[in-house]
Amino acid sequence: MNQKEALMKAGVLAEALPWLLKFQDCIVVIKFGGNAMVDKSLLHTFAQDVVFLRLAGLKPIVVHGGGPQITKRLEEKGIISEFKNGYRVTTGEVVGIVKDVLVNEIQKDIVNAINAMKSMAVGISGDEFDLIQVKKMMIDQTIDIGFVGNVERVDIKQIIEVLESGEIPVISSLGIDNKGQIFNVNADSAASAIAKSLRANKLVLLTDVAGLLGNYPDETTLINTLSLSELEKMIPNLDSGMRPKMESCFEAVSSGVSRAHVIDGRKPHALLVEVFTDSGTGTMITKDLE
């Protein structure tokens, strides 16, 4: 490393200092999803980011879905994936496959990636210990999409215990109803519900686009900041992929989470850029008074 490179890196560290001080002991709920889950190099850099956050004094919580891997597993079994309003139609057969992929494949990969750097990740399935309690979801009160749940309540006790032990919870987006039935839960919705229940400082959704685009797919139309009232007007016109994400951000910030962000998980270290730089990245949702 030459002197110029060293000075540039020192500048980056200096820029991070006020953010390190600001976010000490702050809870950051991170939804990890999209193609970053199937790209080993991106999984590695994501794990680095999460470990860095924890060692820097923040309290990261990872919530993950499994769209690409679930679709692949279903294809292998000859089952065609069906979606309605952005939600996967989940039959009794499919929900068992969903749990297997989420817990035994994806969660395991994330936990192992984090623990390869420092042993501090703890895997938790949302349907265990009544962690994520749900009711069956119906679209527009009439369209049945099977075993897909709306989050009713999050029992935060286990999450807090993991955080207080200095570890990182890695939570699979599953839920359970009052009859013991397991449900598939949209990972954005699960992350939002967990952030609300913990009154987190940040909710960060990693996705496969740069953020909310004014004219999709033109990334030059990226919307950097939106207030709640601005977002509320836009939600009805969003496509089925982005709408659940923005609804999750809206719900979180409306319920006391300080800020919500949608960032590009395809970019290495996007999470650190968002948290520790002045410019940030992606789209930020704030309360109307900011």
Where are these regions (language model features)?
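Nucleotide/pyrophosphate-binding catalytic subdomain
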Residues: 1-266, 273, 279, 288-290
